[in-house]
């Protein structure tokens, strides 16, 4: 009787701070005016990983979303709301688990330690064959370096974009060190601008009317 092949395991880790900023951009400032679809994102990740999967193995994705704020269910200052509940349901529908930090995060000085520690744990116990990380932040560059040293491929989903806000031009860029340590970098802003990739949006994209007047900008990092 032939030996059953172990599945090819994908660890999909989502930096909630990055996704929050990216979602805000696509909903309110991008021409398509829509949030990102988690089902579309999951399918996209599976397609990107498939070429690396041996033909005799099946693909299994384990998804983790790391929220940038404490769980409001245990925080009297920030009561749980229905929009967050719906957000969690969207994640769970795609097999993605929500993680909240135990303490408030300062995104200007550090990344999400739970995200970092979980990737290290999965890598240490060899529970994943490939990592897909959605993030633009340099706080995770050392984690990407660690994966390279352990010969675990990292596919990085990142964004570079700019948009006007309050007479300023907001810039959002993927950290260069994080990008360089990745086995493969995918410029998601280019993917999502492709008219054939509308499945990555919750709603059918509709174009926003662009302002006809000229504006002067001051530059500000997002």
PLM features: residue spans?
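Domain-level signal for Mg2+-assisted phosphodiester chemistry and nucleotide/NA-binding surfaces
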Residues: 1-109, 160
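Nuclease catalytic cores that cleave nucleic-acid phosphodiester bonds
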Residues: 82-221
């Amino acid at each position: 009787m032939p030996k059953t092949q172990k599945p090819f395991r994908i660890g999909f880790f989502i930096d909630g701070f990055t996704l929050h900023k990216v979602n805000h951009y696509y909903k309110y400032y991008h021409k398509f005016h829509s949030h990102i679809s988690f089902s579309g994102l999951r399918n996209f990740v599976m397609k990107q990983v498939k070429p690396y999967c041996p033909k005799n193995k099946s693909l299994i994705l384990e998804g983790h979303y790391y929220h940038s704020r404490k769980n409001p269910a245990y925080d009297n200052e920030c009561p749980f709301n229905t929009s967050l509940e719906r957000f969690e349901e969207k994640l769970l529908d795609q097999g993605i688990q929500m993680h909240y930090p135990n303490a408030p995060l300062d995104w200007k000085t550090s990344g999400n330690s739970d995200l970092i520690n979980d990737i290290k744990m999965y890598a240490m116990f060899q529970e994943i064959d490939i990592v897909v990380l959605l993030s633009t932040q340099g706080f995770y560059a050392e984690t990407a370096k660690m994966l390279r040293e352990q010969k675990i491929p990292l596919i990085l989903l990142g964004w570079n974009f700019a948009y006007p806000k309050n007479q300023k031009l907001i810039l959002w860029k993927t950290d260069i060190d994080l990008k360089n340590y990745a086995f493969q970098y995918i410029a998601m802003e280019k993917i999502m601008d492709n008219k054939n990739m509308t499945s990555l949006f919750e709603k059918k994209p509709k174009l926003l009317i662009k302002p006809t007047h000229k504006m002067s900008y001051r530059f500000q990092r997002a």
